């Protein structure tokens, strides 16, 4: 499957992601372009970008996704932290543009007590500012559905639709559906009926064309738990049935899908999880505008 891969380490340099991806049979690569647990990063040099782009070409130009820092909170009611988050997200977008990474996944943030409506307005204002300034060029901003822990925003399709609405439907905005988060948030896509209900609802509120990436993770916690705990494919509450429905939906055959399952000292866990997912795909599936489920 040309659209299946994993989050890959960049220890030793950003360009090392491609060698690791090849070793784990990834055809999609997700990375952090900087430390996800630090605000600042050493600026990319021309050599950094050239080496990364050369390695990308040598690897056959697989789809690339970046994930932003976990420190960023575009929904913060604190003006200082909000501006700091906007500045950090600006850097994330600029780094993607420099490297040629087509999509940046972000968690919509948390309202930290100000309320969901106020938090969403805050995220929308931040995104509007950056989009109006064309920060990141053509880099897509993919809003990730969250599990809904604490005051996290983005745990419902209504939240995600509202953010797109607040940005006047900007074409650079899309959605990343994380299977662990979706289940924890209360979306039950584990049966054919539940799957159709879930993605019909998504299509009505947001538009299926906005679904531009998947994070494929099983969940240690059950439906509606609001707890974000990833586990290996088939070993959690999503189960193989839920993943089989996604893997065989003709609408999603070209959408990048990346694992974020627990790592092991070697690459065996990613190899095993990818093999499990590939084994769920029926040979008859082909790209089509309509789902067969």
UniProtKB/Swiss-Prot annotation:
Pfam families: AP_endonuc_2. GO terms for molecular function: deoxyribonuclease IV (phage-T4-induced) activity; DNA binding; DNA-(apurinic or apyrimidinic site) endonuclease activity; phosphoric diester hydrolase activity; zinc ion binding. Signal peptide: none annotated. SUPFAM superfamilies: Xylose isomerase-like. Zn(2+) 1 binds at residues 67, 107, 144. Keywords: DNA damage, DNA repair, Endonuclease, Hydrolase, Metal-binding, Nuclease, Zinc. Zn(2+) 2 binds at residues 144, 178, 215, 260. It catalyses: Endonucleolytic cleavage to 5'-phosphooligonucleotide end-products. Its cofactor is Zn(2+). Belongs to the AP endonuclease 2 family. This is Probable endonuclease 4. It comes from Herpetosiphon aurantiacus (strain ATCC 23779 / DSM 785 / 114-95). The lineage of its organism: Bacteria, Bacillati, Chloroflexota, Chloroflexia, Herpetosiphonales. The gene is nfo.
């Amino acid at each position: 499957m040309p659209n299946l891969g994993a989050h890959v380490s960049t220890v030793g340099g950003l360009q090392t992601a491609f060698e690791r991806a090849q070793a784990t049979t990834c055809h999609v690569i997700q990375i952090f372009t900087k430390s996800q647990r630090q605000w600042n990063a050493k600026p990319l040099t021309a050599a950094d970008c050239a080496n990364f782009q050369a390695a990308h070409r040598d690897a056959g130009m697989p789809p690339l996704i970046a994930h932003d820092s976990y420190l960023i909170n575009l929904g913060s009611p604190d003006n200082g932290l909000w501006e700091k988050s906007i500045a950090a997200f600006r850097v994330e977008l600029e780094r993607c543009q420099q490297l040629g990474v087509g999509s940046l996944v972000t968690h919509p943030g948390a309202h930290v007590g100000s309320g969901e409506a106020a938090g969403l307005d805050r995220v929308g204002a931040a995104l509007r500012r950056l989009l109006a300034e064309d920060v990141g060029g053509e880099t897509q901003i993919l809003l990730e559905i969250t599990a809904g822990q604490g005051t996290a925003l983005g745990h419902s399709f209504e939240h995600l639709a509202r953010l797109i609405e607040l940005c006047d439907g900007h074409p650079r905005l899309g959605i990343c559906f994380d299977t662990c988060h979706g289940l924890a948030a209360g979306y039950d896509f584990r049966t054919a009926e539940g799957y159709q209900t879930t993605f019909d609802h998504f299509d009505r509120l947001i538009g299926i064309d906005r679904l531009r990436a998947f994070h494929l993770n099983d969940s240690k916690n059950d439906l509606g738990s609001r707890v974000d705990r990833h586990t290996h494919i088939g070993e959690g509450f999503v189960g193989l049935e839920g993943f089989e429905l996604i893997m065989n939906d003709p609408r999603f055959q070209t959408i990048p899908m990346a694992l974020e399952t627990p790592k092991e000292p070697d690459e065996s866990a990613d190899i095993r999880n990818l093999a499990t997912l590939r084994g769920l795909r029926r040979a008859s599936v082909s790209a089509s505008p309509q789902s067969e489920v």
